[in-house]
UniProtKB/Swiss-Prot annotation:
Part of the 30S ribosomal subunit. Contacts protein S5. The interaction surface between S4 and S5 is involved in control of translational fidelity. This is Small ribosomal subunit protein uS4. It holds the Pfam family Ribosomal_S4. One of its GO terms (biological process) is ribosomal small subunit biogenesis. One of its GO terms (molecular function) is structural constituent of ribosome. GO terms for cellular component: small ribosomal subunit. Belongs to the universal ribosomal protein uS4 family.
């Protein structure tokens, strides 16, 4: 399944979750798009709830189904809870951590920064958004890219960097000090439903 490239706001309303991270999509119209307005939502079956939760998380991180499932399977081989490990692996993606650093206003924009070669890991350029960052690795912006307007604008409006990243705004550099804990990850996701979906 290809990565979704359509209107993010419409998809956010359909899934009932802010994919931009701003929450603006749901402020005026907190219901799915369509001619029937707020009265069109139907009660979902158990399978429907599981599928919806899977789609929420997949689109939140901007992944194809193949990438998403592969990461899910990798999480199942780790000790501990399958669902929590899955969330932690998703959070360790390079494009996501660029977003968490505040270098981009959305994960989609962060993925473009990585794709276009603006991001480095431990001093080496990495242009693979799905690259899994390991604890104690350093993420930075290439010196030639320090003056990018999109990065400057994103930094200006960002007011939160998670505790598992130590960020130096002057150097545009962060160290991924440790893996995230489940309590630090999106509370609106019920990963147990995703485990159930793939276990069917």
């Amino acid at each position: 399944m290809a990565r979704y490239t359509g209107p993010a706001w419409k998809l956010s309303r359909r899934l009932g979750i802010s994919l931009s991270g701003t929450g603006k999509e749901l402020e005026k119209r907190p219901y799915a798009p369509g001619p029937h307005g707020p009265n069109q939502r139907k009660k979902l079956s158990e399978y429907g709830l599981q599928l919806q939760e899977k789609q929420k998380l997949r689109h939140m991180y901007g992944m194809t189904e193949r990438q998403f499932r592969r990461t899910f399977d990798q999480a199942g081989k780790m000790p501990g809870k399958h669902g929590e490990n899955f969330m932690i692996l998703l959070e360790a993606r390079l494009d996501n951590l660029v977003y968490r650093m505040g270098l981009a206003r959305t994960r989609r924009a962060a993925r473009q920064l990585v794709n276009h070669g603006h991001i480095m890991v431990d001093g080496a350029r990495v242009d693979i958004p799905s690259y899994r960052v390991k604890p104690n690795q350093t993420i930075s912006v290439r010196e030639k890219s320090n003056s990018l307007v999109v990065v400057k604008e994103a930094i200006e409006v960002n007011n939160f960097v998670p505790e598992y990243l130590t960020f130096d705004a002057d150097k545009l550099e962060a160290t991924y000090t440790r893996h995230a804990e489940r309590a630090e990850l999106p509370a609106e996701i019920n990963e147990a439903l995703i485990v159930e979906f793939y276990s069917r």
